[in-house]
Amino acid sequence: MVIASWLALTGGGSFAAPVQQEGATCSPSGTALSITAFDNKFDKRCLAAPAEMTFTIDFNNLDRGIPHNLAIYEDDSARKVYFKGELVDGPGRSTYTVQGLSPGKFFFRCDPHPEMNGTFVSG
């Protein structure tokens, strides 16, 4: 009975992507990054790569039948684009290769779902 109640409350043990807190910051730890889209959310609110170095992003879309991408912009106005990944229909995966960015903080989002967004740190 307790297990059945727990399963009902947790959605039957289905995958739930962790989400970092608003305003999360991060620092570069390498040139191979990863991010997952699930339930119209990213599992990370902050990504980071070393400045001026090409890096890859392993992009994993777990949302069945929903296209997502990752694009990096100067800020949340999304006027100046630095990188725009192709749309990936879910479930699906793609590896994006991104030319190095100058040092600073940038904005990333899913273009079809701009509420899916975060901070990109180049340092």
What are these regions (language model features)?
Residues M1-I3:
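Sec-dependent N-terminal signal peptides
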Residues N69-Y73:
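Beta-strand signatures of extracellular beta-sandwich domains
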